Amino acid sequence: MKDKARIVIIGAGIVGCSTAYHLALLGWSDIVVIEQGPIFETGGSTSHAPGLVFQTNPSKTMSLLSQETVKLYSNLELNGNPCFYPVGSMEIATTPERLEELKRRIGVGISYGLDSTMISPKECLEYNPLLSEKILGAMFVKNDGIAKAVRAAESMSNSKAVKNSVEFYPHTKVTNIHTVNGKINSIETDKGSIKTDIVLSTAGIWGPKIGQMVNINIPQKAFEHCYAKTIPIKELENHTKEVTHPVLRHQDKAMYFRQEKDVYGIGSYNHAALPVLANDLLDHKVADISPSIKSFTPEHFELGMIDAGNLIPTLKNIDLTYKINGIFSFTIDGFPILGEWPQVKGFWSAEAVWITHAGGVGKIMAQWLAYGDPGIDTHEMDVSRFHPHNMDKNYIDIRASQNYVEVYDIIHPLQQSEAPRNLKLSPFHKSQQKLKANFVESAGWERPNWFESNKKLLKKFNTSNFLRRGWENKEWSPVAIVEHLQTRSNGGLFDLTPFTKIEVQGKGSLEFLNYIISNELDKPVGKVIYTSLLTQNGGVKCDLTITRLAEEKFLVISGGAMGLHDLHWIKSKLPTNSDIEINNISNSMSAIGVWGPKSINLLQKISGFDLSSSSFPYMSSKKILINKIECLALRISYVGELGWEIYAPTAKGQDLWDSIYNQSEKFGIIPVGLAAFESLRIEKGYRLWGNELSTEYNPYESGIGFAVKLDKKDFIGKQALIEHNRIGLKKVLACITLDKQGAVVMGKEPIIFENKCIGFVTSSSYGYSVDKGIVYGYIPVEYAYEGSKVNILYFGKHYKGTVSKEPLFDPKNLRLKT
């Protein structure tokens, strides 16, 4: 065994092999892959996975990863045998609700470049004559199919690049990982130690056990899953090819099927979650079949077999041969766990990755390791998304189990998890409960979505043109309409406590921050700037505001959900041995947004301060007193109205709320929830990171070029932006209004021009002040001119839309600045 390596990869399943393969293709050498079992039938989930590959996913990144996986597997073979069979897939509908859901999923697939179509019951039977005639239809995706993951892993290991760069050590168990000063130093096995700066854990169901070696609680959980194969089926007796039938999903009954020569494989999620602890997994030496396979539990498969017989009549009462409970991983949010952990430099994970995405994950992990950038937007799966409460054992148990049980459910994009809840409460929470707030959870915070106490305003405003009736009416209330309109007419109180607040101070803080941001920070004390933080390629990594509190002291404000992601990025750029202090002070500060035309009247009354533009200009800050509470006020608004963000110590939060709320009614200012917050920001054209803003687009494409100052000293991404400007824009973020009054879509729908998908919806809502349905999406510049006509495909129907000049509301920003 080598005693030193550039990188040690733990686990020789499909993810580990794919990453090693792609690193070798990028020119890396001195790569070690350690596997506790044999090569390549390792005994992990790769070894028993049925191999079904469905590329449709609500997440663009997950869909792209599966598409990359299909490309990879399709170009691999082992001893003349393919590693992928592109037989297509059918997602079957047996209920009207599922049929409608499939229309939506077809749209999502088209958005992300898939060949997705709805086929009739007759066409379903042409693809698979074994199916029942009672089905209502199916979504057919041409390039889905069956992957042979073990075959693919071995094929990659046989490549010249891998043979020259990678050493595999089978039957070798990792016993410990050593760190020095928070950095990876070496890895210890039962056959010796290897010194290395980088450890990548691709250990799958053993991932949490590896994480414990560096004191990280990986938020994933393993579950047993029932899978069986039938005896030979008479109707398939002449099928000698490995697979010819499209793979099947019967999501109404939480089942899937695959043909394998003359038999059928059947998998069922239609049973209670059966969790398995990583520390309880058997060793290879004592496992009956494999460490990732447990004894079949027929009681959990009874309903599945009844449902299988109803869908495929020839399966009724058929005998089963191969029967297992295979073990594989689920996470708390359904996404894999990728990236370098902030807690330990050099410790990386690529865990909870299914066969469907493994090839693509290996590719982006290699790029991430080699270049510091995965090449696509990975924020949904980045390890930096996890908050401390996400790492709690009880939280992991509940959320991962829920994701197992709901894996094939119809999930509305606004649907909330029922548990665990009430993890983080703002100091205003009890007051919000008294106002009958409808709460949603975001990053652990309970946030008002709307307030039932505002229902009385439905009599004030005519909302008949705005009422929703379909899918878009779920998880929504017309109260959001009046909260929007009342904010525009008078004002609203917004709970901003979940915002992430980061304090940066110390010698060199200005120079440091100015280097990692695109805007110019060297402004007078008290100024507030909006800026992006960029990757070296010019993509938008973060967007946030920075307030200069003193010469070398700054307050960075970021969103709540991605705040730790932004904090990690900022900290990762800090020079070694720097005197700069970066502290997350989020829990110590509460915040209220007081926004709307009468916000100045309210705040001047309760503070006694002159808040006029001459005394308190837009994008500036001051300390003010509200009922003897010292507050930091920032004149900035995320809804496009005159207003201030008011920050005060959390301990004074309830007093702050009472002081503001008790006087607000006199001015017609009401508490407002997130639903109206969203429609207000979209109407104003404000971007949301993760929707409009991501590492895949630069600030000019995103429409935030005003936050870039190319004439300042060097900053991260500057050279890339100069090059982007030289080449010119190919795609831009466009504002599109729907021609039909009252029309609303929900997001991720394809944008169609002359029957061709040219983009997809990043955000959508109704603009109640401009009386238009609004969507945003990236489209090629040749279609992005004002007046350009497009269609939005929503549940199989085409909604006509027009590219419009933005912002739609208050284009001259007069309401913000006066």
PLM region descriptions:
Residues L64-Q67, E91-E101, F140-N158, Y169, ...:
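Short beta-strand to alpha-helix junction loop
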Residues S18, F54, I177-S295, L303-L311, ...:
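Flavin-dependent oxidoreductases
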Residues A5-V32:
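N-terminal Rossmann-like FAD-binding beta1-loop-alpha1 element of flavoenzymes
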Residues D377-T818:
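Glycine/proline-enriched, intrinsically flexible loops and inter-domain linkers
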Residues D252, P275-N279, A287-K424:
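C-terminal catalytic lobe of FAD-dependent flavoproteins
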Residues P50-Y127, D252-F257, K261-G265, P291-S292, ...:
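Dinucleotide-binding Rossmann-like beta1-alpha1 core, especially the glycine-rich loop
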Residues A24-T46:
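Glycine-rich FAD pyrophosphate-binding loop
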Residues M139-I198:
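Helical element adjacent to the flavin cofactor pocket in flavoenzyme catalytic cores
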